[in-house]
Structures are given as C-alpha cells and as structure tokens.
Amino acid sequence: MNYQDTLDYMEWNKTKYEISHKPPKPNFNIYYNCIYWAFLGINVGSEQNKHRPVLVTRHQPNPSICTIIPITSQRLNDSYSFHIDLENFNGTVMVEQMRVIDIRRIDKPIIVNKKTISITQNDWNKISQQIISLYSMKPLPDSEQESPKKVLTTV
C-alpha cells in the first residue's frame, strides 16, 4: 500500500465513522428506481467505491438497508450487456456491482427541476433483464454423476 492509498483509507475510515453516527433515517425520502449520491467507501479490486451515484432498486423489508446499483459518473458506451447507459442521466448502471447498503450511506438525492432523477421504463426493462440474467440461480445438475460447473478459480 502506498502513501496515498493509506491517506485515502484513513479518510474513508473518518467518513465511515461519521456515516455510522448519522441518524438512522435520512431527512429525505428514498424511492425505488431513483438516483442518489452514496458513499461506497474504499473497496477491494474492481468493486466500485468512492462517493458516487447509485440507483436504488429495493428498500424493503428492512427499512435500514436498500439494494443499489452503482452508476458511473460518465457514460461508458461499452459493449458489456450488464452495463446500461441511462437515458435521463449521464452515466452507466453497472448491474454486476449490485449490492445491499445501509441507508445511512445514501447522502442525498440527485435532483433536476426540483425532482429526484428516476430511470425511464426502457432503462428499467434493460436493467431488469440483466438482473435476471446475472443473478438468477442456474439449474442443478440432472444427475449426481454430473459435477457443478467450476465458476471461480481456486489458489
């Protein structure tokens, strides 16, 4: 770890401490399919981190957590099917990075014309399709003779 990484990590720990001592409920409403700023922290490898836009996809049954999908701050315009360039926001939803966070990580809504930005029906359809594709369980093997397909590599 270099000096700058150490400073970034120390700054994130300070921010995380402040987040953990915020009131349990934000002073704004959190709506499904809307875009907010959230603190995702300092993460490992390719995990999305920092203070970045996120799409809230679920906010129940536990009201202290919500499911989010990180959004890039610029459109990626790449060929990955699980990266959806949004119609109403200059960013790309990274469906493969979907996760659950504490609602205290959500900083504030992204507002345009006095309204929290939401996704379009077309965006919703594309994102939904990719969630099903990426996160639905694969069928079990037909017989005990078949072994499950290796997905992750081992050391």
Language-model segments: residues:
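Short alpha-helix capping/helix-loop boundary micro-motifs
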Residues: 19-26
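Loop/turn positions that initiate beta-strands
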Residues: 32-33
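C-terminal terminal-subdomain/extension
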Residues: 1-12, 84-155
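Compact nucleic-acid interaction/catalytic patches
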Residues: 44-88
